[in-house]
Amino acid sequence: LAPHATLTYTGDDCRKVTMTGKIYFEVKHDEAHPFDIKGDMSHVRVLGTKFMVSEGCASSEVYVISGRVLFTAKTEADGVILTKEMRATLAKGAKKPQIAESGSVNQMAWATHKFHFDNTPVNEVLNTLSCYYGTHLSANNTGKRLSGDFDANDLDDILSIIEETLNIKISQK
C-alpha cells in the first residue's frame, strides 16, 4: 500500500476487496474464486497477475506487470483486458477505461524502491527521480543517455553516480 491507501475486506473466504489510493497486488489465479477489487469509480477482476491499481479523485489507473486483469467502470460490464506491461486509465464519469501508453518499469518504483534505466535520455531519468522524490531536477547536458539500476535509498548518492558517469552537473530545486 502506498501512503494513505486503504484496503478493506470481509475476512471470509470471499476474494473481494474495496480500496482507495494506490496498491500493488500479487494474486494467484483461482478460477472458482475470482479476486475482485472495487474502487470509487472502477472494478478490477483479476485473472492471476501482478499489478498496480491507483484510485484517485479524478481517475483510476491499472498497470499490469504480469498476467491479466479485466478493468471496467464500476457500473458497467464492458471493459478492457490488460496483459503484461499494459496500462489503462478510467476518467471519472467515463463508461470504459482507455488503454494508455505502457509507461515505464519505474512506474512501480514506489513499491519496489528500485529504478531501472536502459539507454534512457537524461531528462527522462531526471523526471522519474523528480516525481519519486518530490523535487525538481535539471542538468546542464540533457543530450546524454543512462543505463543502470539503482536502489531508491538516497537521492544524493544516485545523483552523484549519474554526474560522475555522464560527466554532467545536476541541480536540485
Predicted regions and their residues:
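A residue-level detector for the "anchor" residue at the start of short, highly conserved motifs
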Residues: 2-173
